[in-house]
Amino acid sequence: MRLPTLTFEQLDARQKETWSKHAERRDKPVGPYLTWLHSPDLMDKVSPLSNYFRFDCNLPVRLREFGLCVVSRFWDAQYSWSAHVDKAIAAGVPADVMKDIAAGRKPSFKADDERIYYTFAMEILESHFVSEKTFDEARKHFGEKALVDLIGAVGYFSMLSIVLNASETDLNREPPFADVRGYKKT
């Protein structure tokens, strides 16, 4: 980790307040929160957004975890991939789909919602735009409310991935991607 990992005892009053608010919904800060804790005002703004996309948005848990992994792989964010790949599989995403994504291959999807989510996310991430066909298919399948949540989730998960990579958040596991070692492409 490029920034010091702060213990509760090292925090100033403002950081302790933020830590305590965070602990109401989750345990102690880990992953990106270890970085955000250095800016408690930012962490106070990001935490509710994170909670929304992780726990409360209009997409099923399976697609929340799947989407987080799709975006994490795009950004080579090993920490978030490692923290969520097993959750995605436990929620019902086939392990072979996750293996393909980890290897940088487009999976053969059995579930339409996973295929639509993946196609939408990869279009916006790779080209910065979404085709009319992909947008219309996603709107028809998910409905407008869940589609807007999907768009927001791709943006939030991108921010999360960037924070994890820029701060080089400790992985504490075997690297999940064959083409990434440390925080560099091989």
List where the protein language model places each region.
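Hydrophobic alpha-helical segments
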Residues: 1-186
